[in-house]
Amino acid sequence: MGKQTKKKKSTGAAKEIFAKPPGRLGKWNVIAFVVLVIGEFIYYYAATPAINIQSTSFWVWMVISVALVGFCTLDFTVESNDTRSVATKATKPAAWIVVIMIAVGLIMVAASSKLFCASKYASLINIEDGDFQTDIPESRQINDIALMDTSTARIIGERAVGSLSDVVSQYEVSGNYSTIDYNGAPMKVAALNYAGFIKYMNNRKNGIPGYVLVDPVKNEAHYIQTEKPIVYSPSAYFNNNLYRHVQMAYPTYIFEGFYLELNDDGNPYYICPVLESHAGLFGAKDVKGVVICDPCTGDTEYHEVSDVPHWVDRVYDGDLVCQKYDWYGELSGGYWNSVFGNKGCKRTTDDYGYKVMDGDVWVYTGVTSVNGDESNIGFAMMNLRTGESKYYKVAGAEEYSAMASAEGQVQHLGYKASFPSLINISGIPTYIMVLKDNGGLVKMYALCLLYTSPSPRDTR
């Protein structure tokens, strides 16, 4: 009887522990909130999202965070080996905030769409009619043309570093080459990356010693050692990570990418374009300025698009300028015309190339009808520093058709064509491309007028 009495008292004591005034926060809730706050700080440090209402990732983060706040306000009560959650006074407001945020977010997504803002999407780019013979300098010698594509640059760049045992054992050449104008000459530049987390930990105090510079005209690559080591890199971790460093310096900015460039003295800088929306809250994002980061010192400086230094080449990304042209070509006649009528609708082809002219880097791409045939109705060129855009009404074969035609001429050799460059031969728009073997070595080149078949030539 005595033992049974003690058991009943023990059970009663357990009920008293969990029995607290309903609707109030208890010790479990306080612990949950502390864990949540710590988790939020860890997430922000790891992901470093932009704290900006024009960022969809920021909205997702906020909705999840408020939902977790609501979860932390629940009161978990134990009754007869059953665990039940009971809402407190703070749970319902948190739930309503989540519902309202989701509803507002969906409304803003709809209000930012092409359906309601077609004219704003179409007006992001100003297209001028260009004169091909005047705008594009005439090419007189093949050996003065930059014909190297990125895959070939990677091969040559890795060879330049491969002979340096102390470098190649700790670092690897980035596959992201930037096409730049370096003191009047077209160049491709790539950073060195840490070859994994362990290599970063072993070398973080020494930093990255240099970068790779590739000459696409001479087919040469050089490893350039910097006076000061590169401390901030996309391949670094913790506080040395370039993205984290720049985003935390400008927490409200929405960054579009990070591109390595060189100033006139050969010093490396990362160009970080900043985006803002022009249609509703989320739509029609375009570059409003750039943050220039010195990766050796960590110093950063913001410039509006109109105030960017002349040595900077990549304010706009090639994908972005082509996207803006597509919006212009498809939505100038209104949204419903782009869906059903397609009257006057046009868009860029699937890829683009780079052309260095007058100290700037331009993107060129074919323009075709939305009906999707294998011919171009013209081509467009966009300046990646100023955003200036020109359209040339020159009909002919689209780039991939020219590549396929060139490969057909040497199909017995099995060579593959690179994406063509656009040149001016006696006032005639002409594609020129290299033909490579299975090992990626350049064997021949092919010339193709926009409206004729290609003529392959041996590189010798």
Annotate each predicted stretch with a short phrase.
Residues 228-364, 370-376:
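Long alpha-helical, hydrophobic tracts
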Residues 451-460:
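Single conserved hydrophobic/aromatic residue that forms the stacking wall/gate
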Residues 168-204, 257-291, 349-381, 418-445:
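Exposed beta-strand-loop-beta-strand "reactive/processing" segments of non-cytosolic proteins
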Residues 381-391:
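Surface-exposed loop/turn elements that mediate protein-protein interactions on large endomembrane-trafficking
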Residues 89-114:
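Internal/C-terminal transmembrane anchor helices
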Residues 115-189:
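Membrane-interface segments at or immediately adjacent to transmembrane helices
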